[in-house]
Amino acid sequence: MMKFPALTHYWPLIRFLVPLAITNIAIDLGEQALNRGIAAVKEDAVEMLASYGLAYSLMKFFTGPMSDFKNVGLVFVNSKRDRTKAVLCMVVAGTVAIVFHTLIAYTNLGYYIINKLHHVDESVGSKTRKAFLYLAAFPLLDAMAWTHAGILLKHKHSLLVGCASISDVVAQIVFVGILLHSHLECVEPMLIPILSLYMGALVRFTIVGLGYYKVIHDNIPESSGPEVGGDATIKKMLSFWWPLALILATQRISRPIVNLFVSRDLKGSTAATEAVAVLTATYPVGHMPYGWLTELRAVYPAFDKNNPSNKLINSGTVVTKSHIKRFTFFCLALSITLCFMVFWAPHISESILVDIIGVDHAFAELCITPLRIFSFFPIPVTIRAHLTGWLMTLKKTFVLAPSSVLRIIVLISSLIVLPYMGVHGATLGVGSLLAGFLGESTMVAIAACYVYRKQKKKKDSDEDMTIDGEDSAPMNEVRSRGRMDDIVELREEDEEELDED
């Protein structure tokens, strides 16, 4: 068997990321399977696709912040007590989401948000509110699954997480096929994708839940020891989580905002419904070649030397920051190549839309230009994911909050300005999303530079203090550990670069 010594340090990264990348792609395939379940209903298929797309994108706004609790499990959960606190936070948040879904479905608030703001007709609005009610419990189920997935990732069980997500998609596809042959197609076709979505999430939650109890629960202590800073408090978890939640909320609310402006730009006409349907169909297809890059966020925390579950150092295989940077660049190059192969080569994207989602050729033609714009998304997504992972390791996520604000500002500005330049429909929506991504990644880069310079200043000042008092043993050694860790991080990074040169 051939061995490649130069790749030795990259195999752990590949083994960790590949299941997560497959997970991300599998989620997109699941969305396409759900869209096919709607498209297979020949009567009012476009209207149904638009209604489900509006409801699903609004629901994702609530699911997004809670699913990002995966990163809390990845960084903070070191004991059973930590896990209990994380689950409690998710139960409370899920209950709030259920209440809000119910209010949207049954009160004038829902009529204003869906019918009035989106300028959709009464039929589409009614179907959207009904779908939103059916999706009320999904955010809680999804968040519970992702919380346990984060704990599994902390212990390098990314393969188990990947298997759970693939099983989720398989369950969705199977149930779409089963329900299409049931009486639901005639009675309530909207339930076909929604019930399939629930069954897939239930399968995923069952697998990660059983996996947690099988491989982790008995191997972690009741409470965290002082070597990891003691038990994480709910306040610390929420302080770490809220900037990530805000970012993901703005990412998820971007789709409803795009749907809103695109629909209003076309005055709620038949063309508006068609444009929203095109966006619903192109989101999962366009996201598939680059969406997995988001999982690069988990690489830094998982391979952090301070992670108590990290056994790579003991096994002799050390993954340094330089290895992670090179691996990230390779992933970016691979994603860009995939995007241009799929979206710019003749007939490939149309075949995906026709054969997998089940739309007709005329509808697929409308999706070509929006899909080609997706080819440029990998660059800002990679920059954002790589730097966010580094900041998560330092537990300095608070500096990321402004990036979400800038993303929304750039997104809305583009949605307002581009129509005056002759850009309309789904092309307007995807082009504005790209502008928002670029604005967000720029702000994340600025935040990372700010933190890095601050760390450098700390390193320089503490080196001076160490020289002055190197013969003394400070009484507050434990208390100053967090600060010294940051300095060691920077010092080791410099040493790694010198060693490899």
UniProtKB/Swiss-Prot annotation:
The cellular location(s) given in this protein's UniProt record come to: Membrane
Task: Quote the biased-composition stretches of kind Acidic residues, using this chain's numbering.
Answer: 462-471, 491-501
Cytoplasmic topological domain residue ranges: 1-85, 153-158, 211-327, 384-403, 453-501
| An annotated GO BP | regulation of bone mineralization
Task: Return the InterPro entries for the record.
Answer: ANKH
Q: Name one Pfam family in it.
A: ANKH
> Which Gene Ontology molecular-function terms are recorded?
inorganic diphosphate transmembrane transporter activity; phosphate transmembrane transporter activity
Topological domains annotated Extracellular: 107-131, 180-189, 349-362, 427-429
For this record, the Gene Ontology CC terms, alphabetical, are: plasma membrane
Which residue spans traverse the membrane? 86-106, 132-152, 159-179, 190-210, 328-348, 363-383, 404-426, 430-452
Biased amino acid composition, Basic and acidic residues: 478-490
Membrane topology according to the record: Multi-pass membrane protein
Its keywords, alphabetically, are: Membrane, Phosphate transport, Transmembrane, Transmembrane helix, Transport
From the UniProt entry, list the residue stretches annotated as the region Disordered.
457-501
Protein purpose:
Regulates intra- and extracellular levels of inorganic pyrophosphate (PPi), probably functioning as PPi transporter.
Family, similarity comment: Belongs to the ANKH family.
Q: What is this protein called?
A: Progressive ankylosis protein homolog B
Its source organism is Danio rerio (Zebrafish)
Q: List the gene name.
A: ankhb
